[in-house]
């Protein structure tokens, strides 16, 4: 039996096989087969060929080539002076929705500030409610400023829309001013939540995961907590009516 192979490396080895002296010739080659040749008589010649690659394989498994990826047009850095350099995957619809939400937050803050001024009057003198609505106004203004900062982070343009002038009188002959004001606050918080959910839907529609995360983490949780808290205040004011219980409720707000 004989099988040839190329690039043969041969060496000899003497051993005793079956009592006869034999000379084995081992050969290592670069082919992909194993062969042996056996001569008649007491002499045996063996040729062994081990598999090896003809050429080194090219490097594989590269999954990211940055300089090739950077050739994509949408990754080019703008050179126009009035164009944001940081803007990426931020739609015009999302930009407009953020500007609208800024306006919502400022409007609600303005109403709360008017409520603060009303309850701080000397002839109303419900200092706890005044404190509550002043803090609520500041909180809504902080929300607006947070949205402004986010708009700039994403490369959008902040556009401030007009703010509606709120009422200055909150008397209600049946409910009383405290309950009426708190019910108004509850409605405003629910309206704000509805507007925030709209911004979140805009983010989903435009596959803007970063905007969705921002609204979820910074606003939505806090919003439902505010709704729950004010809903409890409404319930308590309904229980106490318009009498002395309002003063006790006000004192609790003042010292919270």
Swiss-Prot record:
The keyword Plastid applies. Residues 55-87 are annotated as: Extension peptide (EP). GO terms for biological process: intracellular iron ion homeostasis; iron ion transport. It is found in: Plastid, Chloroplast. Pfam families: Ferritin (PF00210). It comes from Vigna unguiculata (Cowpea). This is Ferritin-3, chloroplastic. Coiled coil: none annotated. Fe cation 2 binds at residues 140, 189, 223. CDD domains: Euk_Ferritin.
């Amino acid at each position: 039996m004989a099988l040839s192979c190329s690039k043969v490396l041969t060496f000899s080895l003497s051993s005793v096989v079956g009592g006869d002296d034999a000379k084995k010739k081992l050969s290592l080659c670069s082919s992909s087969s194993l062969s042996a040749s056996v001569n008649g008589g007491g002499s045996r010649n063996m040729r062994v060929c081990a598999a090896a690659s003809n050429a080194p394989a090219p490097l594989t498994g590269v999954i990211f080539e940055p300089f090739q990826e950077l050739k994509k047009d949408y990754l080019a850095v703008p050179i126009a002076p009035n164009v944001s350099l940081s803007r990426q995957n931020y739609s015009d619809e999302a930009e407009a929705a953020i500007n609208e939400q800024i306006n919502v937050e400022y409007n609600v803050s303005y109403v709360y500030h008017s409520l603060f001024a009303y309850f701080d009057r000397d002839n109303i003198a419900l200092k706890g409610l005044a404190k509550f609505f002043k803090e609520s106004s500041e909180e809504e203004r902080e929300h607006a400023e947070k949205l402004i900062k986010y708009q700039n982070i994403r490369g959008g343009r902040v556009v401030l829309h007009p703010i509606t002038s709120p009422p200055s009188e909150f008397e209600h002959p049946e409910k009383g001013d405290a309950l009426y004001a708190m019910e108004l606050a509850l409605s405003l918080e629910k309206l704000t939540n509805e507007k925030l959910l709209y911004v979140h839907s805009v983010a989903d529609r435009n596959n803007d995961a970063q905007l969705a995360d921002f609204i979820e983490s910074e606003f939505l949780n806090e919003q439902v907590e505010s709704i729950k808290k004010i809903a409890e205040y409404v319930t308590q004011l309904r229980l106490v009516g318009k009498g002395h219980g309002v003063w006790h409720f006000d004192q609790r707000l003042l010292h919270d």
